[in-house]
């Protein structure tokens, strides 16, 4: 046994490689052992340090892989399970347990998280050399009973199925202990690099091999000052020093100091010594100069995105300045990998920097996992429509084209069907021939056939079920789709998809191993498959060695790369505080460690945090050979964050914090990193809306624009202006002539007018391009309205011989039997319930019609407008026609005055502010249209709410009071002529604010015509601005902004181009109500018309 240590600025790997070469020269076969996270890097470093750059006698490996290189005899042939197989075994065993048998975990026995925690505990106990029977020492009776029962069940199952238990290392330990290793131990040597602690399992291997006479060399980083100090607690080197002291004491071998004398103390050595002295409370006077501050820089950035952009620019700049540098000379360390992963790819692709993030990717979000999840949902929830759509959207099931899938999805959404029997019925319903039923039925059979065959599978042996699954994958064209998908991808993506398929097949292999000979139902198989795939991970390797390696900062080793950028070093990320999320608490771990034999030790993360984090910080400070950049953003994951305390210490020693910002207001030579990044910088520069006033900057932009313009012209491309906000183009004359020929009538409806004033571009989408909402066979607000309209139309047309209630019931019965409504409201139990609610509404609304003797209905569903009478005349002489339909026309019996009624499903009132801004023209339009048809005598225009009044019983003193309050809401709301109001009864809300004189009435009609004229002129000119209106000047209502995905309008960026509603200019902040408010708006209307 030989123990070595060296100072942190001397390469330990180089020293240990020399030791390995000496052992090879002595005839030994050397196993160079590195930690799992560093094994690939160590292999490359060892090869670089070898005098001949290669050796057949040195194998760089990990502890777990050593068994592969040793000859093990007479070991029983057992199948080894990995985490996926182990998870399936736990799932199977827990499924067989009755929830009542488990006191703590019964309710969550098949929860994926619990299974994951059980797997972790299984591995942890194996590594710590602890038997599951040691759990008898747990003090919590319920937990002890549950864990013992679970592990006994799993262990018995693994033994029964001849499945290997434990890790590869535990098998090696067993083989050495039982003399089952035929390799000559005298010819073997171990060199161990990069460890600051051994697990109980690793220490047992070292102990056994040492006992067999294997030469072992172990090296670690430590300063002589730290190693010889009698007190190491709190020291930066505490982890490595305690490790060396423990081994020295155990094997009676003092550690040798292999530190080298450096001619000059570099910046990183200086920072290390200052940090060490601050933690061991010794005094040290070292000056930090400008060169040190240049070599070790501390950046303070605003956001994570800005950090990455600055790093990318810095790398590009260094590559530009020094042609000898390549990407492999750079290393990026992340404070939190998950938070940077997405932005990293976006920004580094933009700057054309190849990188490799050495991290396994989860399969949870891959389409193949979603494919299995969708089939499981179809089986479990009995063929829901949404699950079938999700299955088709994976693009892995069937070889249908995207247009076929879209057509099928649109049709089944139209039908609103759920359940396999509904899908098995031939599609026969169509909407005025809109759907190609013949083609849809062909698609239906193609989609259903493989699923029907699979879902017919009963509980059977796992082998048979896997055969049926294989047939399903072929019939459903899943394998073909995956092949087609990969052929169109780049090489890197093809490799990624290959790894995913391997992982998928591996889950199936593990399932076959675990459930060999067992009876399994299809739903359980799919659940297990999905669970296994969710746990699966895959990893790709970089296509080339020359890439920027990216990793978590806590996996770094000293002297790793020439230039190191460590970003995201906030207080939350540095240091990392390991949390115990396992099934055993720290107290329980401590108790188990005390009650079990020596050499059996569970890790207690909280006790390791301090010494581990200090050693990690030391490694981080010494990770670079030439230049180190430490950065912390002010905003991390959209929350305010502070820089790490370790960075503050370095600043205290004399290193300077540099405020770094991306400056889009100016362009510099640093922007010339790559073509894509330059283009991005140019876009950002334009989007600032500000141009630098300096002549030099303006000249640079002009020249740059000309160069890019010439390059684009050579390739036959256009150089478009960079838009700063969404905008629309005016329609060409040819288009306008095709849309609105001069000899053809131009029609505008009241709903079209409202849409235009909501957002001009919405009018263009709906009334010019004909954008339609998705069709639904199920009842919706439109069908509800038509149903109620039809009932009242029929009830009022029936002869007056019978009472109103009898006529209403007859109308309800006849309308319900109409083919259109019968199809809708008999479709499902939900639709039938909706119909009953609507009938209650009809009977309630009938109360107003039943007790209103002052009026008589003369027309229902009355059409108005047409070619005979133009609504308005434009300045160019062109006529505008308005057409529509009035729900009902009433007549006063007293003097024959006419009134119009529009049915509404909710409370609607006429509002002067909305009318002035073009958003409430319905009632004035109806009156104007009837006036143009010859009617002169009106009593008003109103809305009638068709709804059951809801009254809070808490707000009234008695039930009688509730009836009175409810009846107040059941009134006609709208506009009434003052001279006719005396003839109207209690069912009309005729307060002063709603009453108009003849002059005011005409004023409203004139302004309404003015609104139509303004809209018609813009429409006929082909100008449709993207200008949704805003009422409060701060946001856009959702119903106004319905086409955001098309227009790209975002209120937080583009509110300036929204249409701000006109408001009253009130002095002294007065608030007007009632009659005064009406008069104020009428005065504003007069002013607008007189302009």
Swiss-Prot record:
Highest taxon in the source lineage: Bacteria
UniProt KW DNA repair keyword: yes
Protein purpose: The heterodimer acts as both an ATP-dependent DNA helicase and an ATP-dependent, dual-direction single-stranded exonuclease. Recognizes the chi site generating a DNA molecule suitable for the initiation of homologous recombination. This subunit has 5' -> 3' nuclease activity but not helicase activity.
Record protein name field: ATP-dependent helicase/deoxyribonuclease subunit B
Source organism of this protein record: Streptococcus pneumoniae (strain Hungary19A-6)
Keywords carried by this UniProt record: ATP-binding, DNA damage, DNA repair, DNA-binding, Exonuclease, Helicase, Hydrolase, Nuclease, Nucleotide-binding
Cofactor(s) named in the record: Mg(2+)
Family, as annotated: Belongs to the helicase family. AddB/RexB type 2 subfamily.
PANTHER family from the UniProt entry: RECBCD ENZYME SUBUNIT RECC
Subunit structure: Heterodimer of AddA and RexB.
Other remarks on this protein: Despite having helicase-like domains, this subunit does not have helicase activity.
UniProt GO BP: double-strand break repair via homologous recombination
HAMAP family recorded: AddB_type2
Gene3D superfamilies the record matches: P-loop containing nucleotide triphosphate hydrolases
Record-level Gene Ontology MF annotations: 5'-3' exonuclease activity; ATP binding; double-stranded DNA binding; helicase activity; hydrolase activity, acting on acid anhydrides
Entry EC number(s): 3.1.-.-
Chain coiled-coil ranges: none
């Amino acid at each position: 046994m030989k123990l070595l240590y060296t100072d942190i600025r001397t390469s330990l790997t180089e020293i240990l490689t020399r030791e390995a070469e000496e052992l090879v020269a002595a005839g030994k076969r050397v196993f160079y052992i590195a930690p799992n996270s560093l094994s690939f890097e160590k292999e490359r470093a060892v090869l670089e340090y070898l005098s001949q750059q290669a050796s057949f006698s040195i194998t760089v490996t990990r502890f777990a892989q050593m068994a592969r290189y040793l000859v093990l005899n007479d070991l029983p042939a057992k199948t080894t399970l990995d985490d996926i197989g182990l998870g399936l075994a736990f799932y199977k065993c827990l499924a067989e347990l009755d929830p009542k048998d488990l006191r703590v975990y019964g309710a969550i026995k098949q929860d994926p998280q619990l299974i994951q925690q059980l797997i972790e505990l299984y591995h942890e106990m194996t590594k710590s050399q602890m038997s599951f029977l040691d759990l008898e020492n747990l003090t919590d009776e319920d937990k002890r009973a549950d864990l013992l029962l679970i592990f006994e069940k799993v262990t018995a199952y693994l033994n029964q199925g001849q499945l290997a238990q434990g890790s590869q290392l535990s098998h090696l330990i067993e083989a050495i202990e039982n003399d089952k290793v035929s390799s000559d131990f005298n010819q073997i040597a171990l060199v161990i690099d990069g460890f600051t602690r051994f697990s109980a399992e690793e220490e047992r291997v070292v102990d056994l091999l040492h006992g067999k006479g294997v030469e072992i060399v172990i090296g670690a980083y430590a300063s002589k000052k730290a190693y010889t100090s009698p007190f190491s607690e709190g020291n930066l080197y505490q982890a490595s020093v305690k490790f060396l002291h423990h081994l020295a004491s155990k094997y009676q071998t003092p550690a040798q100091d292999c530190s080298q004398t450096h001619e000059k103390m570099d910046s990183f050595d200086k920072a290390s010594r200052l940090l060490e002295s601050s933690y061991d409370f010794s005094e040290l006077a070292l000056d930090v100069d400008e060169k040190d501050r240049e070599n070790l820089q501390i950046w303070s950035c605003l956001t994570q995105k800005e950090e990455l952009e600055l790093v990318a620019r810095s790398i590009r700049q260094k590559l530009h300045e020094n042609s000898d540098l390549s990407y492999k000379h750079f290393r990026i360390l992340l404070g939190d990998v998950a938070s940077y992963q997405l932005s990293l790819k976006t920004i580094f692709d933009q700057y054309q920097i190849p990188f490799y993030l050495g991290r396994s990717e989860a399969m949870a979000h891959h389409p193949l996992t979603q494919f299995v999840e969708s089939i499981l949902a179809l089986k479990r929830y009995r063929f829901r429509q949404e699950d079938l759509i999700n299955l088709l959207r994976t693009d892995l099931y069937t070889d249908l084209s995207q247009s076929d899938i879209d057509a099928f999805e649109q049709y089944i959404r139209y039908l609103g069907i759920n359940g396999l029997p509904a899908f098995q019925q031939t599609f026969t319903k169509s909407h005025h021939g809109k759907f190609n039923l013949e083609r849809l039925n062909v698609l239906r059979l193609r989609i259903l056939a493989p699923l029907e065959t699979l879902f017919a599978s009963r509980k059977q042996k796992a082998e048979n079920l896997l055969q049926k699954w294989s047939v399903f994958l072929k019939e459903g064209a899943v394998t073909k789709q995956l092949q087609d998908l990969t052929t169109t991808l780049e090489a890197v993506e093809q490799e990624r998809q290959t790894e995913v398929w391997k992982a998928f097949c591996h889950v199936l292999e593990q399932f076959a191993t675990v459930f060999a000979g067992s009876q399994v139902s299809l739903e359980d198989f799919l659940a297990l498959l999905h669970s296994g795939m969710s746990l699966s991970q895959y990893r790709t390797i970089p296509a080339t060695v020359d890439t920027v390696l990216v990793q978590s900062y806590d996996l770094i080793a000293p002297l790793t790369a020439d230039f190191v950028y460590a970003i995201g070093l906030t207080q939350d990320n540095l240091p990392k505080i390991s949390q115990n999320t396992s099934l055993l608490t720290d107290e329980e771990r401590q108790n188990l460690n005390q009650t079990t034999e020596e050499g059996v030790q569970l890790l207690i993360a909280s006790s390791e945090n301090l010494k581990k984090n200090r050693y990690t910080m030391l490694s981080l400070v010494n990770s670079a050979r030439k230049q180190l950049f430490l950065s912390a953003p002010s905003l991390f994951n959209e929350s305010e964050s502070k820089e790490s305390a370790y960075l503050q210490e370095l600043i205290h020693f004399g290193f300077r914090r540099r405020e770094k910002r991306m400056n889009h207001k100016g362009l510099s030579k640093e922007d010339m990193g790559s073509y894509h990044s330059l283009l991005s910088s140019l876009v950002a520069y334009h989007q600032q809306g500000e141009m630098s006033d300096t002549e030099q900057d303006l000249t640079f932009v002009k020249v740059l624009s000309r160069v890019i313009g010439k390059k684009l012209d050579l390739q036959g491309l256009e150089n478009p202006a960079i838009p700063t906000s969404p905008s629309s183009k005016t329609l060409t004359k040819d288009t306008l002539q095709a849309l609105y020929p001069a000899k053809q009538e131009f029609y505008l409806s009241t709903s079209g007018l409202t849409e235009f004033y909501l957002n001009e571009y919405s009018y263009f989408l709906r009334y010019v391009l004909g954008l339609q909402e998705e069709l639904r066979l199920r009842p919706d607000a439109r069908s509800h309205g038509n149903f109620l309209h039809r009932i009242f139309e029929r009830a009022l047309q029936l002869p007056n011989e019978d009472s109103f209630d009898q006529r209403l019931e007859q109308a309800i019965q006849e309308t319900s039997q109409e083919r259109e409504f019968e199809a809708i409201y008999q479709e499902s139990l939900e639709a039938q319930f909706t119909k009953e609610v609507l009938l209650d509404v009809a009977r309630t609304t009938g109360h107003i019609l039943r007790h209103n003797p002052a009026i008589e209905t003369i027309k229902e569903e009355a059409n108005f407008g047409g070619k005979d009478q133009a609504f308005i005349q434009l300045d160019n002489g062109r006529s505008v026609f308005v057409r529509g339909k009035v729900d009902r026309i009433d007549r006063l019996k007293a003097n024959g005055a006419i009134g119009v009624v529009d049915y509404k499903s909710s409370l609607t009132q006429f509002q002067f502010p909305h009318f002035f801004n073009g958003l409430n023209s319905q009632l004035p339009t109806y009156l104007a249209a009837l006036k143009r048809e010859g009617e002169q005598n009106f009593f008003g225009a109103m809305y009638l709410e068709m709804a059951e009044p809801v009254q809070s019983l808490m707000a009234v003193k008695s039930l009688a009071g509730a009836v009175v309050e409810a009846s107040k809401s059941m009134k006609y709301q709208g506009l009434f002529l003052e001279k006719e109001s005396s003839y109207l009864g209690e069912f009309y809300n005729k307060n002063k604010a709603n009453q108009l004189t003849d002059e005011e009435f005409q004023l409203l009609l004139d302004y309404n015509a003015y609104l139509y004229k303004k809209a018609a002129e813009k429409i006929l000119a082909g100008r449709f601005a993207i200008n949704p209106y805003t009422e409060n000047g701060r946001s856009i209502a959702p119903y106004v902004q319905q086409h955001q995905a098309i227009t790209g309008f975002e209120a937080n960026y583009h509110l300036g181009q929204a249409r701000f509603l006109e408001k009253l200019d009130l002095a002294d902040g007065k608030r007007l109500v009632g009659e005064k408010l009406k008069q104020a708006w009428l005065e504003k209307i007069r002013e607008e018309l007189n302009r």
